[in-house]
Amino acid sequence: GKSTLMKLLMSVFNVSSGEIYLDLKDNKKLYIDKNSRKMFAYVPQGNFLLSGTIRDNLLIVSPNATDEEIYSSLKIACADFVDTLPSGLDTMLGERGIGLSEGQVQRLAIARAILTKSPILLLDECTSALDEETEKRLLQNLVNLQNKTCMIITHKKAALSICNKEVCIEDKKIIVKEN
């Protein structure tokens, strides 16, 4: 249900009835369709990286990003461990990120999403492999992002604590609670 909802937002699946739209601040509605996909950056549960360098894996979403933009996204995603690797951004990875821990792969996937500059981040269990301290820093960094909306699927209270709204799916109904 939850991951499917995110895929509906990105128009990966078509709705069988009804409509999907975003309520904007100026009381306008933005209807979601395949043309609105660029508004979303999705970090799926069970992230993956391709074989190649860390730089290649980040630039795949933003080929013209500068090193400054890359390092900024790495810092926000608490992926500054890249600086400690012998070849830094040019460190070679195996398929699916072999050579890195699951938590490091998650943070690189988040950095990649931030690098897209999409206004809405969809994060599906994106902190599941992070230790408590790293998760806390990452979540605070996400709160501090300007002009970004983050939608987080989580089972962890730490992630829920930074959210201003909680959306629950109960008995096939969407319930929105203010936090």
What annotation goes with each model-predicted range?
Residues 4, 41, 46, 54-57, ...:
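ABC-family ATPase nucleotide-binding domain "signature/switch" substructure
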Residues 1:
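Conserved glycine(s) of the Walker
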Residues 19-26, 55-95, 139-140, 147:
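ABC ATPase nucleotide-binding domain helical subdomain, centered on the C-loop/LSGGQ "ABC signature"
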Residues 14, 19-38:
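ABC ATPase NBD Q-loop/coupling interface
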Residues 13-14, 162:
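A position-specific signal in ABC ATPase nucleotide-binding domains
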Residues 51:
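The conserved phosphate-sensing helix
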Residues 10:
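Helix-to-loop junction immediately C-terminal to a conserved catalytic motif
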